From Swiss-Prot:
<comment type="function">
    <text>Together with its co-chaperonin GroES, plays an essential role in assisting protein folding. The GroEL-GroES system forms a nano-cage that allows encapsulation of the non-native substrate proteins and provides a physical environment optimized to promote and accelerate protein folding.</text>
</comment>
<dbReference type="InterPro" id="IPR018370">
    <property type="entry name" value="Chaperonin_Cpn60_CS"/>
</dbReference>
<feature type="binding site">
    <location>
        <begin position="86"/>
        <end position="90"/>
    </location>
    <ligand>
        <name>ATP</name>
    </ligand>
</feature>
<dbReference type="InterPro" id="IPR001844">
    <property type="entry name" value="Cpn60/GroEL"/>
</dbReference>
<protein>
    <recommendedName>
        <fullName>Chaperonin GroEL</fullName>
        <ecNumber>5.6.1.7</ecNumber>
    </recommendedName>
</protein>
<dbReference type="GO" id="GO:0042026">
    <property type="term" value="P:protein refolding"/>
</dbReference>
<comment type="similarity">
    <text>Belongs to the chaperonin (HSP60) family.</text>
</comment>
<dbReference type="InterPro" id="IPR027413">
    <property type="entry name" value="GROEL-like_equatorial_sf"/>
</dbReference>
<dbReference type="InterPro" id="IPR027410">
    <property type="entry name" value="TCP-1-like_intermed_sf"/>
</dbReference>
<dbReference type="GO" id="GO:0051082">
    <property type="term" value="F:unfolded protein binding"/>
</dbReference>
<dbReference type="GO" id="GO:0016853">
    <property type="term" value="F:isomerase activity"/>
</dbReference>
<feature type="binding site">
    <location>
        <position position="492"/>
    </location>
    <ligand>
        <name>ATP</name>
    </ligand>
</feature>
<keyword id="KW-0067">ATP-binding</keyword>
<feature type="binding site">
    <location>
        <begin position="476"/>
        <end position="478"/>
    </location>
    <ligand>
        <name>ATP</name>
    </ligand>
</feature>
<dbReference type="InterPro" id="IPR002423">
    <property type="entry name" value="Cpn60/GroEL/TCP-1"/>
</dbReference>
<feature type="binding site">
    <location>
        <position position="413"/>
    </location>
    <ligand>
        <name>ATP</name>
    </ligand>
</feature>
<dbReference type="Pfam" id="PF00118">
    <property type="entry name" value="Cpn60_TCP1"/>
</dbReference>
Length: 540
């Protein structure tokens, strides 16, 4: 395919036009008085949203050079969303400001490499100052406040704080569509996995068709149990304790299953058998998780253990186990807390090392099950369009809340970025590096400027007063008042603000140092066939 190539100012100008189109579309959503954007969908009803990354992903421009600029900024929003889960609108406004100011200087003859170094130095100083002025987030009320700001709903804030309190900061919180109109919270405490009882005759509650084991022993193995003689010595030992037994195995079949069922029906022995969760290496890891949680040992050839030689020492224990036809929940495992903490640390390091989103998601699930449970926020709404929009907002709020707990919070509404201007301005730089620093100083004002503009106020006036105010005091664009931002609940997670600034500076610097752009030349359309002469149609 033939290529179209542009150089220097032509190349940068074309990309900047794309940056402007995307950023101008997204920035209308910024702040409490931000508007919505309607996105056409190929199928179904249009999507109405104010989520920056969702809008950015939908924008596709006809001009290839402009589209490249737009896609680079879209990448900033996506990257910020991946790292922090929120702040995507700010992440599109900032690169536009840096590119716009930088392009003026590059066009005037400044060295783009020097400017880039200045931008990087200034952003590093800004990030350090953000961390200095950050306040830690702890307690249910503070978490609810962060979530309420991001979702624009106090009720959603309460649900998220309740969920995080119940399942822990590392717990899995999923967002699903409700069948009703109300949004509700459902929490499954303990370790749950998707494997039910192997026989319905193992239930203890015939009405609910569940088996509930109080204070059971737990046998964990990756072997298939077909011969009851393999586990008979162990069963006799458990029988002496008069406590129930949960068997987690690759499978239980042959004579073993009917023998266990028969003893259960006769009341000799309360036992439930389930298949091991997962497959392959993931199954081994999950069985090890269960063993650590319950204080047991996986009976496996990898450790040189055999079922017929197993003793009571390999059995795990828990306060309660509930098994239905589809799932098993282990509550309050008797495992050593330091061993569990060590296992959690290992899984976290694996999450950081993996490049696969699927693997990261599965590791997160394992982490949650070890940490305490799973919470489900079921989103309800009157229409499908409202439901989609609400779901996006809650996802953003959940991510922002996790980010806030991780790195703390700063004043919201762009105030924190203005608060760090003094520290950045104090940097002693020369020449083009100083120009790069000044570009960042101007860009740090941009979110406040746009929030004020969307609310009908003059941005320059707001920024001038903000620079003279104490750190923490800011402008509430919702009602036009000057308030203590944190006390009022107008807050941003440091991780969100930091990620948006760092990613924006990175991509903007790349655009400013671009000297050539290569795009695919559109192929000429094939000529359409001429219409047939009616006289040649045989009189039809």
């Amino acid at each position: 395919m033939a290529k179209d190539i542009k150089f220097s100012a032509d190349a940068r100008s074309a990309m900047v036009r794309g940056v402007d189109i995307l950023a101008d579309t997204v920035f209308v959503t910024l702040g409490p008085k931000g508007r919505n954007v309607v996105l056409e969908k190929a199928f179904g009803s249009p999507l109405i949203t104010n989520d920056g990354v969702t809008i950015a992903k939908e924008i596709e421009l006809e001009d290839h050079f402009e589209n490249m600029g737009a896609k680079l900024v879209s990448e900033v929003a996506s990257k910020t969303n991946d790292i922090a889960g929120d702040g995507t609108t700010t992440a599109t406004v900032l690169p536009q400001a840096i590119v716009r100011e930088g392009l003026k200087n590059v066009t005037a003859g400044a060295n783009p490499i020097g400017i880039r170094r200045g931008i990087e130095t200034a952003v590093s100083a800004a990030v350090e100052e953000l961390k200095e002025i950050a306040q830690p987030v702890s307690g249910k009320e503070a978490i609810a406040q962060v979530a309420a700001v991001s979702s624009r709903s106090e009720k959603v804030g309460e649900y998220i704080s309740e969920a995080m309190e119940r399942v822990g900061n590392d717990g899995v919180i999923t967002i699903e569509e409700s069948r009703g109109m109300e949004t509700e919270l459902e929490v499954v405490e303990g370790m749950q996995f998707d494997r039910g009882y192997l026989s319905q005759y193992m239930v203890t509650d015939n009405e609910k068709m569940v088996s509930e084991l109080e204070n059971p022993y737990i046998l964990i193995t990756d072997k298939k149990i077909s011969n009851i003689q393999e586990i008979l010595p162990l069963l006799e030992e458990v029988l002496k304790t008069n406590r129930p037994l949960l068997i987690i195995a690759d499978d239980v079949d042959g004579e073993a299953l009917p023998t266990l069922v028969l003893n259960k029906i006769r009341g000799t022995f309360n036992v439930v058998a389930v298949k091991a969760p997962g497959f392959g290496d993931r199954r081994k890891a999950m069985l090890e998780d269960i063993a650590i949680l319950t204080g047991g040992t996986v009976v496996t050839e990898d450790l040189g253990l055999d079922l017929k030689d197993a003793t009571m020492q390999v059995l795990g224990q828990s306060a309660k186990v509930t098994v239905d036809k589809d799932s098993t929940v282990i509550v309050e495992g008797a495992g050593d807390s330091s061993a569990i903490a060590n296992r959690v640390a290992i899984i976290k390091s694996q999450m950081e090392a993996t490049t696969s989103d699927f693997d990261r998601e599965k590791l997160q699930e394992r982490l949650a099950k070890l940490a305490g449970g799973v919470a489900v926020i079921k989103v309800g709404a009157a229409t499908e369009t409202e439901l989609k929009e609400m779901k996006l907002r809650i996802e953003d709020a959940l991510n922002a809340t996790r980010a806030a707990v991780e790195e703390g919070i700063v004043s919201g509404g762009g105030t924190a970025l203005v608060n760090v201007i003094e520290k950045v301005a104090a940097l002693k730089l020369n020449g083009d590096e100083e120009t790069g620093r000044n570009i960042v100083l101007r860009a740090l004002e941009e979110p406040v400027r746009q929030i004020a503009y969307n609310a009908g106020y003059k941005g320059s006036v707001i920024i001038a007063r903000l620079k003279q105010s104490e750190i923490g005091t800011g402008f509430n664009a919702a009602n036009g008042e000057w308030v203590d931002m944190v006390t009022t609940g107008i807050i941003d997670p440091v991780k969100v603000t930091r990620s948006a600034l760092q990613n924006a500076a990175s991509v903007a610097s790349l655009i400013l140092t671009t000297e050539a752009v290569v795009a695919n030349k559109p192929e000429p359309e094939a000529p359409t066939a001429p219409a047939m002469d009616p006289s040649m149609m045989g009189g039809f």
